[in-house]
Amino acid sequence: MTIQLRQICLVARELAPAIADLTEILGLNTCFVDPSVGVFGLENTLVPVGRNFLEVVAPIREETAGGRYLERRGGDGGYMVITQADTRNSQKAVRANALANGVRVAHEIERDGWSLCQLHPGDMVASFLEIEWDRHEDLSGHWMPAGGSGWEDKVCQAVTVDFVGVELQGPDPEALAALWSAVLGTPVIQDGQNLSLRLNNAVLSFVLQTDGRGAGLGGVRLAVRDREGILLRAKARGCPVTDDQVIICGTRFCLQTE
């Protein structure tokens, strides 16, 4: 069973400023807007990061799940870990693992040649976990949330190359890691105090919440080619920075030089 980290979704109070920060600071392009998220009271934009994607959603009406999440976590931040399964059977296995561990299915779509399963963030503790499959079974190509194809010419890796990992935080990192391990069918790797799961192309790390925002998707690790340029542009746009990290859309982006 192979599971690819294909997309990371952030949630923001306002879409345009978040997308402007992400694209200008990280040297990325927008590639797709999905009108179907309007049924959830949201608007969105997707940005390719290598052959994978960063998405931002924002509420366009009151009383939405995204709006409640913003209130609960005190502002913009991480929202969903979105994965792609190599086969339909792999997707079904993750879904079965979730149900066996008391995790509810929050939303499902079944269409000819495409299937989506979202697992409830209340049960996954740190974020939604979404598992998608489509008949192309191409982990670096066709991707339904980005319109299938047509996004490829928007890929720019001159500054930001790809995802390396995601940081999930909570009050009990060991329990959080064990839960995600059971659902994804991937063993926990323990290196001293560090807990992680390895997906096909990225690592999920589990850490103690220390920022006062509670459990959530707290950070994204990126492979980059121009860390200094990223930090300079982030400072110019008023985003908090350290020597190897910038906070954009309420999310810690750790910059790992290639």
What are these regions (language model features)?
Residues S36-V39, E110-D112, G212:
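A short beta-turn/loop motif at secondary-structure boundaries
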Residues M1-T64:
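An N-terminus-focused feature that recognizes amino-terminal "leader" regions
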Residues P35, H107-E110, I189-Q190:
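Short beta-strand
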Residues A16-N29, K92-N101, D172-P187, A236:
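Amphipathic alpha-helical segments
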Residues Q4-R13, T45-V47, E55, G67-G165, S196-R198, A202-L208, ...:
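Vicinal oxygen chelate
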Residues E174, A178-A182, V188-R221, R225, ...:
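Intrinsically disordered, low-complexity segments enriched in Gly and acidic/Ser/Thr residues
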Residues Q4-L5, C9, S149-Q193, A202-V203:
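Surface-exposed interaction/gating patches
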